[in-house]
Regions:
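Nucleotide-activated sugar donor-binding and catalytic core shared by glycosyltransferases
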Residues: 1-200, 204-282
């Protein structure tokens, strides 16, 4: 059996696809990774990139191009697994046309348009949050896939990052694309002089460091970020929530207020289980 993994866009879709692929490789199951519409830099390993457009009139030419680009890969697969978002459309449409077995993964508590549209063609929709299952007749709750990241002592992680401080370390992460709002919180906390702030600022920020702060656009090894931090302030994308739970870190979630408000529902899921505190941006 050969499994084709279709993902792309942002880290919220790519990270669970990589976790799934890691497990397939551990079990020696043949697989291929297709990524489309990449908006972020991500250590994805070997993969094939294809054209993907958003689900509107202007995106149709890119979708059509992506269908042609992914035809052979889909044709050679037995099963196609899509990880949500518009980038999965070209390979999943190919899978429908080629009568392949289709499975989908929904990363948010409030499902997006892509999975809602494609779910009737899928055998199952695997949901990261229980709340999402009620939107699909074939939905099943599976939790959040997280890569097997190394967990090391705080002192060791700080040494690798060349951080020397006796202050509490506040880790701030705004998702794979970064967050200007959370970057502002990072700068404010630095100004108090009461904390060392380790922030993943994404493409909206710059690499910089000082006596009580270190701002990094991107971490190749995100485990160093979590292992160095005493507490986390984060957006509420699925990947961040999964990693916070994996590293067992106390956290304050400030969900991204746009994109249909799906991060609010993600954050509520963890908050209701006592896994984090939550504040709305306003």
């Amino acid at each position: 059996m050969r499994i084709l993994i279709a993902s792309g866009g942002t880290g919220g879709h790519i990270a669970p696809a990589l976790a799934f692929r890691e497990e397939l490789r551990r079990r020696n199951i043949p697989n291929e990774l297709l990524l489309g519409g990449l908006k972020v830099r991500f250590p994805a390993g070997d993969h094939f990139e294809f054209s993907a457009g958003e689900l509107n009139l202007s995106g149709i030419p890119k979708i059509v191009k992506g269908i042609f680009q992914t035809f052979d890969a889909v044709n050679n697969a037995d099963v196609v697994v899509g990880f949500g978002g518009y980038p999965q459309f070209p390979p999943i449409l190919n899978a429908i046309l080629n009568n392949k077995s289709i499975y989908l993964f929904e990363p948010d508590a409030l499902p997006g348009k892509s999975n809602k549209f494609l779910s009737p063609f899928a055998q199952r929709v695997f949901c990261a949050f229980r709340e999402a299952t009620k939107y699909f007749k074939n939905g099943i709750f599976v939790g959040i896939p997280v890569r097997k990241l190394p967990i090391i002592k705080k002192e060791e992680a700080m040494k690798i990052l060349k951080i020397e401080t006796s202050l509490p370390v506040v880790g701030i992460i705004g998702g794979s694309q970064g967050s200007e709002f959370l970057n502002g919180i990072a700068r404010f906390l630095v100004s108090t002089g009461k904390f060392f702030v380790l922030a993943v600022v994404g493409k909206r920020g710059e690499n910089e460091e000082g006596k009580n702060y270190k701002f990094v656009k991107f971490f190749e090894d995100i485990s160093l970020f979590y292992c160095s931090s005493d507490v986390i302030i984060s957006r509420a994308g699925m990947s961040s929530i999964g990693e916070i739970a994996y590293f067992k870190k106390p956290a304050l979630l400030i969900p991204y207020p746009y994109a249909g408000g799906h991060q609010v529902f993600n954050a509520l899921d963890l908050y209701n289980f006592g896994g984090a505190e939550m504040l709305l941006e306003n």
